[in-house]
């Protein structure tokens, strides 16, 4: 049996900013009350300027990443342009909806920058999707994260400010949610680049919150 199928628990955050988007997750994966991994990857690059966060079953999430990454590359080869974030979301929504009788146990955030500007979409396990215009959180620690996001988010926020807010939201969620913990992984996407922040720089920002 594939143990990845049973690795669960997470908190993810997505923030829409004026100049891009910020995606962030903690890195703990659990099997019941057991901490199965302290370095679980939960942010995946889907296209040049598109990322996806995953909450739920790691095995299901990795299957989705493999499929949608290939679909994105095929679209670019055929059309000579990148698929839009809305297009990726529609593909994922159809895939998840098609599995509704044997659902893939995931919550996803798709975020990035395309010709229409910065955008983030959230998807549930049955394929329902919502365009998020502000800040969003998924996973077991999301109630705690939302408390910070709702209090501190502003519509004129830049990605620099968004990074600080995402780290603060996850830092607080990890204090109360046993399925969330360890390090924080942060990705910043602007019209120019997809960048994963240095873990040491993220840790220094967390130390200022203690």
Swiss-Prot record:
A GO molecular-function descriptor: threonine-type endopeptidase activity
**Gene Ontology cellular-component terms listed:** cytoplasm; proteasome core complex, beta-subunit complex
Q: Which residues form the propeptide?
A: 1-9
Reaction it catalyzes: Cleavage of peptide bonds with very broad specificity
Q: Can you say where in the cell this protein is located?
A: Cytoplasm
User: One Pfam family for this entry, by name?
Assistant: Proteasome
Question: What are the GO BP annotations of this UniProt entry?
Answer: proteasomal protein catabolic process
Active site residues of this protein: 10
Relay the activity regulation note.
Answer: The formation of the proteasomal ATPase PAN-20S proteasome complex, via the docking of the C-termini of PAN into the intersubunit pockets in the alpha-rings, triggers opening of the gate for substrate entry. Interconversion between the open-gate and close-gate conformations leads to a dynamic regulation of the 20S proteasome proteolysis activity.
Q: Which family does it belong to?
A: Belongs to the peptidase T1B family.
NCBIfam families named among the record's database cross-references: arc_protsome_B (TIGR03634)
Q: How does it assemble?
A: The 20S proteasome core is composed of 14 alpha and 14 beta subunits that assemble into four stacked heptameric rings, resulting in a barrel-shaped structure. The two inner rings, each composed of seven catalytic beta subunits, are sandwiched by two outer rings, each composed of seven alpha subunits. The catalytic chamber with the active sites is on the inside of the barrel. Has a gated structure, the ends of the cylinder being occluded by the N-termini of the alpha-subunits. Is capped at one or both ends by the proteasome regulatory ATPase, PAN.
UniProt name for this protein: Proteasome subunit beta
Q: Which organism is it from?
A: Methanococcoides burtonii (strain DSM 6242 / NBRC 107633 / OCM 468 / ACE-M)
The organism's taxonomy opens as: Archaea, Methanobacteriati, Methanobacteriota, Stenosarchaea group, Methanomicrobia
The encoding gene is psmB
């Amino acid at each position: 049996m594939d143990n990845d199928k049973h690795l669960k628990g997470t908190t993810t955050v997505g923030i829409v900013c004026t100049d891009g988007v910020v995606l962030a997750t903690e890195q703990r994966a659990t099997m019941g009350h057991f901490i199965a991994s302290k370095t679980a990857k939960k942010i995946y690059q889907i296209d040049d300027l598109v990322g996806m966060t995953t909450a739920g079953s790691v095995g299901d999430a990795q299957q989705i990443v493999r499929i949608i990454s290939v679909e994105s590359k095929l679209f670019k080869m055929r059309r000579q342009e990148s698929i839009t974030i809305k297009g990726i979301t529609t593909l994922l929504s159809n895939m998840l909806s098609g599995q509704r009788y044997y659902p893939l146990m995931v919550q996803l955030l798709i975020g990035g920058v395309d010709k229409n500007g910065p955008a983030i979409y959230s998807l549930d396990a049955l394929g329902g999707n919502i365009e998020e215009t502000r800040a969003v959180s998924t996973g077991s620690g999301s109630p705690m994260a939302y408390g910070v996001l709702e209090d501190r988010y502003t519509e004129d926020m830049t990605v620099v400010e968004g990074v600080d807010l995402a780290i603060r939201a996850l830092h607080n969620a990890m204090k109360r949610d046993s399925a969330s913990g360890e390090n924080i992984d942060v990705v910043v996407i602007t019209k120019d680049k997809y960048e994963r922040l240095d873990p040491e720089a993220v840790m220094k920002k967390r130390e200022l919150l203690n």
